[in-house]
């Protein structure tokens, strides 16, 4: 990272993805904030589209730009499933991440969709129990989950074959 900039920051991990993204966004200085995960890929053609989009921002002034996020691939590794995700956000007080797991920014103001694809190319399995552990910690701390968190908690319980817990 230091080969590109001297602006490299350290965030002490605390099982909260929204806190990590909000920390990163707090360091942004431009009119817009763009994010990627370490295992996201932007192909060359998509990079050209991003540069074209960058030139249009001053004229269109969107608050949130939703880009395609590929998360499923066919047998030839070509993207086969995607959804739109907030990727480029106007730097303002409304660009706030929520959710310790499966974090998101609630869309605000002028929202546009662009035909630009980011590919999620997960490397390795990581900690298969991480999300479940965080959800259970949230329940111990708060006693309840938001409807969105309940949905993802149910999925984690299902993935861990805790079907009765997932159904309740």
Residue positions per predicted region:
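Catalytic-site signature of metal-activated, phosphate-bearing donor transferases
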Residues: 19-25, 42-165
């Amino acid at each position: 990272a230091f080969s590109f900039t001297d602006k490299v920051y350290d965030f002490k991990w605390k099982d909260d993805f929204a806190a990590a993204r909000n920390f990163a966004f707090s360091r942004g200085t431009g009119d817009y904030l763009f994010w990627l995960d370490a295992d996201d890929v932007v192909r060359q053609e998509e990079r050209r589209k991003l540069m074209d989009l960058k030139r249009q921002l001053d004229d269109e002034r969107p608050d949130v730009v939703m880009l395609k996020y590929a998360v499923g691939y066919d047998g030839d590794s070509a993207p086969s499933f995607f959804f739109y995700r907030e990727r480029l956000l106007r730097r303002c007080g409304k660009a706030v991440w929520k959710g310790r797991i499966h974090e998101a920014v609630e869309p605000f103001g002028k929202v546009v969709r662009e035909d630009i694809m980011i590919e999620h190319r997960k490397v390795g399995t990581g900690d298969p129990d991480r999300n479940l552990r965080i959800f259970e910690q949230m329940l111990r701390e708060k006693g309840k989950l938001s409807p969105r968190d309940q949905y993802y908690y149910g999925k984690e319980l299902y993935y861990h074959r805790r079907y009765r817990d997932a159904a309740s």
